């Protein structure tokens, strides 16, 4: 009986360990098509590793988050990103960071990070922030939003549409921590309505989504769709 219990325990333990470690790594690109020969590949899911004997402290250092970015644009917003691309020591560590600068009433428009959760920390200013859930059982979506002040922290779950609006009359600054060395970003308006080939009458939308689809979906005329694309160029 004791031998049977021990056997059952070992089987259960082995099954648990298998389930714990038999998971795919987090993707760091939109896709990574496999090749049989390494010399046929142009990208890897991550970066090749530097010889440890050649690593130095500068590989783990980035300078510049003390400098505000230029917010003189239509949105009144700019981001300074720190990822494995400009801080090589982040490679494989699963994190990145960004400084977000806002002009008065500046907006980081609705967007998603397909590969990362974001933690937003307010350094200066007053913000209205929020995220929208994925489709619920009733087909709707729920908004979670708050007003944040200096020192407040808000989290945006991975892949969900979210935004940050500076509702103050002064510039605002925030720091965002992201749970991927390459979180990716999809700005909703640009992805859906941004024109790619204005000369193509029926394929004005990036990435070439038929105008008929959007006219039917939003129940608006093609002229309204075309006007919207022109504002997202």
From Swiss-Prot:
GO terms for molecular function: manganese ion binding. It is found in: Secreted, Extracellular space, Apoplast. Mn(2+) binds at residues 111, 113, 118, 162. Expressed at high levels in unstressed roots. Keywords: Apoplast, Disulfide bond, Manganese, Metal-binding, Secreted, Signal. Residues 63-215 form the Cupin type-1 domain. The keyword Signal applies. InterPro entries: Cupin_1, Germin, Germin_Mn-BS, RmlC-like_jellyroll, RmlC_Cupin_sf. GO terms for cellular component: apoplast. Residues 1-22 form the signal peptide. The keyword Disulfide bond applies. Pfam families: Cupin_1. It comes from the Eukaryota. Disulfide bonds join 32-49. May be involved in seed germination. Belongs to the germin family. Oligomer (believed to be a pentamer but probably hexamer). This is Germin-like protein. It comes from Mesembryanthemum crystallinum (Common ice plant).
């Amino acid at each position: 009986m004791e031998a049977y219990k021990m056997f059952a325990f070992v089987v259960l333990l082995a099954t648990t360990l298998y389930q714990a470690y038999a998971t795919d790594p987090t993707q760091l690109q939109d896709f990574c098509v496999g090749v049989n020969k390494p010399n046929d590949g142009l990208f890897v899911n991550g970066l090749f590793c530097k010889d440890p004997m050649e690593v130095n402290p500068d590989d783990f250092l980035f300078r510049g988050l003390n400098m505000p970015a230029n917010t003189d644009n239509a949105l009144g917003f700019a981001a300074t990103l720190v990822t494995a691309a400009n801080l090589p020591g982040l490679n494989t560590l699963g994190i990145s960071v960004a400084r977000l600068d806002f002009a008065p009433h500046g907006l980081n428009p609705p967007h998603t990070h397909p590969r990362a959760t974001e933690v937003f920390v307010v350094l200066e200013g007053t913000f209205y922030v929020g995220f929208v859930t994925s489709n619920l059982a009733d087909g709707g979506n729920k908004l979670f939003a708050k007003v944040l002040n200096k020192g407040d922290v808000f989290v945006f779950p991975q892949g969900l549409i979210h935004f940050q609006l500076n509702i103050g009359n002064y510039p605002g600054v925030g720091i965002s921590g992201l749970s991927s060395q390459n979180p990716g970003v999809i700005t909703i308006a640009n992805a859906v309505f941004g024109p790619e080939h204005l000369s193509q009458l029926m394929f004005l939308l990036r990435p070439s989504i038929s105008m008929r689809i959007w006219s039917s979906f939003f129940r608006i005329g093609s002229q309204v769709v075309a006007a919207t694309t022109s504002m997202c160029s």
